[in-house]
Amino acid sequence: MEPGFWHEKWHQQQIGFHQQDINPFLVKYWQQLGLPADTQVFVPLCGKSLDMCFLAEQGHQVIGCELNELAVQHFFSDNQLEMTQTTVGEHQHYHTEQISLYQGDIFTLPKTITQAVTAFYDRAALIAWPESMRAQYAKQLASLLPSGSVGLLVTLDYPQEALSGPPFAVSPTWVEQHLSDDFDIEVLASQDVLADNPRFIKKAVPWLNEAAYLLKRK
């Protein structure tokens, strides 16, 4: 999947993958990670997600990485946050006192940026990749996370032939097969969310499950 695909999605505001509210699984399960308030939390492919505001409200230092510049700028403007912009290597660094977003390719993000991270949150990153690229992303995420880091992974699963992503379908079997080498995995929840997603109903997708996993980097 080329970067131009995502840039065009944001330019055309075809961002059905963006949630207007804080993810319910984040609200329900984040406290189970038992993190101190000043924890550094990494959010890959963060977009302009309101979930980052929730994490900041818990006292965390949020470190996000997002390919699209428009998404990053919208996050700060939509939430009326004054930020400072600098250049860090190949990435543009937008930051407030508590939130740092690195705009650029996650595959070239320096590991020094996440070396003090002890937690992570992936709601829209794993499901953003087609299956042909997903395992490569999963390995990159693991390489950016120090051993012992804990995180919340949220996925969607549905019959992939019924709808072209993103978001793409990620099954529990895929999670186990491709993440278990690098993470300890605990299933927290799985529920049918089809009724809450009109886009999937309109496309006659027969079922849609959202799942939450607790991951710990080995």
From Swiss-Prot:
S-adenosyl-L-methionine binds at W10, L45, E66, R123. Its EC number is 2.1.1.67. PROSITE patterns: SAM_MT_TPMT. Pfam families: TPMT. One of its GO terms (cellular component) is cytoplasm. It is found in: Cytoplasm. It catalyses: S-adenosyl-L-methionine + a thiopurine = S-adenosyl-L-homocysteine + a thiopurine S-methylether. Keywords: Cytoplasm, Methyltransferase, S-adenosyl-L-methionine, Transferase. GO terms for molecular function: thiopurine S-methyltransferase activity. One of its GO terms (biological process) is response to metal ion. It comes from the Bacteria. InterPro entries: SAM-dependent_MTases_sf (IPR029063), Thiopur_S-MeTfrase_Se/Te_detox (IPR022474), Thiopurine_S-MeTrfase (IPR025835), TPMT (IPR008854). Transmembrane segments: none annotated. PANTHER family: THIOPURINE S-METHYLTRANSFERASE (PTHR10259:SF11). Belongs to the class I-like SAM-binding methyltransferase superfamily. TPMT family. This is Thiopurine S-methyltransferase. The gene is tpm.
